[in-house]
Amino acid sequence: MILATTKIEDFDRFWNAFSTKGAEKRRQHGSKGAHVFRDPNEDDRVWVVFDWDEEGWQNFISDPEVPAIFQEGGLQGTPKAAEFVRPHDA
């Protein structure tokens, strides 16, 4: 799992790119799905939980075609992944 966050210009613009070109590119890098959340305190921030491994995430972020998709989606910078600390059973 990968938890990532970024700021966006407009949610509809973000969603249009995320759910089309972004989804296709993520799939190419092994993503199995995502859950998108809007931040309750910052209207211009989204959080996404990806069903993805670290290698796939890094390959996606370094793909030379991805910045254009981010720009189309109105992202304000490259998404940042939270550091995974450890799992817990409850």
Regions found by a protein language model. Give the residues of each.
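Short linear sequence elements within intrinsically disordered, low-complexity coil regions
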Residues: N16-S19, A23, E42, E55-W57, ...
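Short, well-ordered beta-strand segments in beta-rich or mixed alpha/beta enzyme
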Residues: M1-I8, A34-D63
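Short amphipathic alpha-helical segments
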Residues: F11-G33, P64-F70
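Glycine-rich beta-strand-turn "strand-cap" elements at beta-sheet edges
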Residues: H29-V46, I69-A90
